[in-house]
């Protein structure tokens, strides 16, 4: 199999780190992104990219095109979560959640698609969540961001089909990644007399299920199979 040029966002931890390493081990040319570090992970070349910043995205895409001449696969994995009651969410919390999880996907696709259309081939894999097919209490804006990714991906798949660009959705359930430890918590909800106790109890259940979830390598294996298939 000819090595593919693959770009994966959020590659410094969790699904992104495992998947980028697995794809690299299979002989692919893998570029990973992180907001903070450009230190390479073995054969995975890391680039500093903020998916909410179009300038940093364009700079990274330009570097890959300059070095490789193409991008065969884009894996939109970067994401974050804020736990709290929908009613008490601040405008900033909502903005951060949607900017990263939804508009980050939009920004990356818009940057890569011109090259895929020109090549008349390409593959975009968007990492959604079980939270993108059902609303999860106290994770409401996370769910909303993933529902948005679902609708966007389904529409995009139809629009770019004539250019031989495939768009795939992956909807993981509970996995033991660093997502649990990195989840932001709404202090307004935690301290609220009506929501607080219910929120903390819900959070305990979610965190227990995540810590007892599957190893992220299982999802990485599924993504590797999607990359390998001509028509996933």
Q: Which residue stretches match the model-derived regions?
A:
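Conserved glycine-rich cofactor-binding loop
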Residues: 12-13
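A glycine-rich helix->loop->beta "capping" turn
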Residues: 63-76, 82
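Substrate-binding pocket helix/loop in short-chain dehydrogenase/reductase
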Residues: 85-86, 90-95
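Residue(s) in the substrate-gating loop at a strand-loop-helix junction
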Residues: 129
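SDR active-site lid
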Residues: 162-232
């Amino acid at each position: 199999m000819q090595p593919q040029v693959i770009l994966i966002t959020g590659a410094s931890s969790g699904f992104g780190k495992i998947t980028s390493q697995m794809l690299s081990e299979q002989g692919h040319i893998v570029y990973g992104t992180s907001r903070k570090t450009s230190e390479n992970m073995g054969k995975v070349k890391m680039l500093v990219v903020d998916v909410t910043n179009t300038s940093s995205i364009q700079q990274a895409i330009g570097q890959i095109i300059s070095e490789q001449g193409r991008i065969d696969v884009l894996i939109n994995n970067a994401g974050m979560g804020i736990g709290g009651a929908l009613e008490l969410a601040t405008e900033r919390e909502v903005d951060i959640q949607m900017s990263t999880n939804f508009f980050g996907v939009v920004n990356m696709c818009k940057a890569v698609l011109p090259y895929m259309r020109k090549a008349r081939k390409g593959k975009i894999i968007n990492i959604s969540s079980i939270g993108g097919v059902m609303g999860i209490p106290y994770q409401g804006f996370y769910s909303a961001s993933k529902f948005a990714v679902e609708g966007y991906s389904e529409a995009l798949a139809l629009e770019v089909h004539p250019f031989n660009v495939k768009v795939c959705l992956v909807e993981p359930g509970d996995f033991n990644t660093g997502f649990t430890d990195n989840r932001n918590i709404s202090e307004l909800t935690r301290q609220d007399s009506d929501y607080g106790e219910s929120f903390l109890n819900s959070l305990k259940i979610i965190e227990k299920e995540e810590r007892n979830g599957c190893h992220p390598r299982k999802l990485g294996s599924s993504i590797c199979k999607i990359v390998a298939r001509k028509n996933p």
